[in-house]
Amino acid sequence: MVKSYTLGKSERLKSRKRLEALFKGGKSFSHFPFRVYYILSSESKTEAHTPPLVFGVGVGTRNFKKAVDRNRIKRLIREAYRLQKQLLVQKLNARGGRMDLFFIFTGKEIPDYSFLFQHMQTVLQQLEQRIDQSYE
């Protein structure tokens, strides 16, 4: 049985090289309270042992001066993503592609988990549509 509700170390976007490529050459869109950056690529160009979906999250210091607040928001976003990423992973596996994904929180107040969960669902549905469009 595959563990589908996990967000392990290999699924986190931490490589400086990949982050630079994502912000320079990737596509982006906004859906409050997120700014989403992503790059779609085919499986053949990348290493075979990497997961199909790699994820990162950031919260700016402009609106949240305290690290405690930034870390709480990042934890909430990671949890909302972890519980809803399965459809996106299945779609990428079916298409034979992979995606680097980075969320930047653009809100000005600490959100409730239910608010983030709903908006994460909408953003992931938009990403599914973009995957379908790119493989047509």
Question: Residue ranges of each PLM-predicted region?
Answer:
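Positively charged, solvent-exposed patches that mediate nucleic-acid binding
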Residues: M1-E136
